[in-house]
């Protein structure tokens, strides 16, 4: 266990949403937690995932849509996404997503997971990521600058180490629910529902 909207639909939505190139956020802003849902939701899921992890893709494509519909979009649960890259390519993709403006973050990782087999297996993965970044409004020069930002790269690595230290995360995806439940792997929606249904009562 390193552990779809149809792809065309996702790509078109991505392009139409972000046609204007934007200045990347500061390092501090780039490293801030990315929260899906209402920040004040009573229940918190912390997700540790790698953008090159096939099981993480499975969760985002098959399970997350149902979690969003039932719990996240209804204000009952928020999901905090934390990068846990296992390899240099996963780290590179994480840097790219973090260099997008925060309101574009989940759109970026949605496309990265949907197209994972394309860019992660490409003979020229950097160029493949650059193309995705351009579709999302990230200037290639800014992407390269972000990759050279040692504070950003080191900060992402530190988040992985913090996950290992604080929650004994050693595989992706790993989910910590309110600090007292752990789910490891791309478990189906029903496994999350068993825990969340009790917490939101």
Where are these regions (language model features)?
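Residue-level signal for pocket-adjacent positions within structured domains
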Residues: 30-31, 114, 178
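Structural alpha/beta surface segment adjacent to cysteine/selenocysteine redox centers
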Residues: 51, 57-134, 139
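Residues at secondary-structure transition points
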Residues: 36, 40-43, 91, 103, ...
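Short clusters of hydrophobic/aromatic residues that line enzyme substrate/ligand-binding pockets
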Residues: 35-36, 119, 183
